[in-house]
Amino acid sequence: MGQKIHPHGLRLGITSDWKSHWYADKNYAEYLAEDIRVREYLVKTLDRAGIADVVIERTRERVRVDIHTARPGIVIGRRGSEADRLRTSLEKLTGKQVALNILEVKNIDANAQLVAQSIAEQLTNRVAFRRAMRKAIQGAMRQPQVKGIKVVCSGRLGGAEMSRTERYHEGRVPLHTLRAEIDYGTYEAHTTFGRIGVKVWIYKGDVVGGRRESEINAPAERRGRGDRNGRPRRGGQRRQRSEQKQEG
């Protein structure tokens, strides 16, 4: 069912792509376990860098790791020192040459993983869970490519004795529709009362004919002051003429 299954796994090859790009026969289990270790190491080491996604691509000689982050400065470090340290650690972990690509996520409020992480960080800092959830929903719905969002928090919310689940949503989130582009992210908040799980679904439109609505609805570059066609407004010309008459 659409509500139970992972949205990314359900839409693999339809609207979403694999996060590991390689082929293996007898070494499949070894590569898979290695990918898991690489991702766990990066998430643990760069917990404050806002890691949105990690894509791994393998060839015979080397491993390429693409890190999608909201704060690339933390990952790179001063004069690339942190990136060099990460590369050395990953080469020891994989036993191959590692090419590290650090990519910035510009639209943070439209990324489900970063939204979930933001809510979890607020819960850790003792912000009221309803306030954190509503703030995340309002920030996401301001983005032009976001058509709907659903947020779920589970655990001892507000320090209650009994754990419960709270859900908030706005707009459309069609989890059964395969052509729907659903971004999904999870994160855990470590509080004094225990762990609180955060899940976020963001609907960004449909994918029709290989074209994504989110790319079509992406915010365009801001024009200068003028009319819709980019021409200067007439008021400015009138002001210039009146000033010229006064000077004459």
Swiss-Prot record:
Ranges for the region named Disordered are 213-248
Task: Identify the InterPro entries for this entry.
Answer: KH_dom, KH_dom-like_a/b, KH_dom_type_2, KH_sf_prok-type, Ribosomal_S3_C_sf, Ribosomal_uS3_bac-typ, Ribosomal_uS3_C, Ribosomal_uS3_CS
SUPFAM superfamilies to which the protein is assigned, alphabetical: Prokaryotic type KH domain (KH-domain type II), Ribosomal protein S3 C-terminal domain
Q: Which Pfam families match?
A: KH_2, Ribosomal_S3_C
Which regions span the lipid bilayer?
none
Residue ranges annotated as compositionally biased, kind Basic and acidic residues, are 213-230
Please verify whether the record's keywords include Ribosomal protein. Answer: yes
Q: Which GO terms describe its molecular function?
A: mRNA binding; rRNA binding; structural constituent of ribosome
Q: GO annotations under biological process?
A: translation
Q: Does the keyword Lipid metabolism apply?
A: no
**GO cellular component annotations of the record:** cytosolic small ribosomal subunit
- Family in the record: Belongs to the universal ribosomal protein uS3 family.
Give the protein name, as stated in the record.
Small ribosomal subunit protein uS3
What is the species of this protein? Corynebacterium diphtheriae (strain ATCC 700971 / NCTC 13129 / Biotype gravis)
Query: What broad taxonomic lineage does this protein's source fall under?
Result: Bacteria, Bacillati, Actinomycetota, Actinomycetes, Mycobacteriales
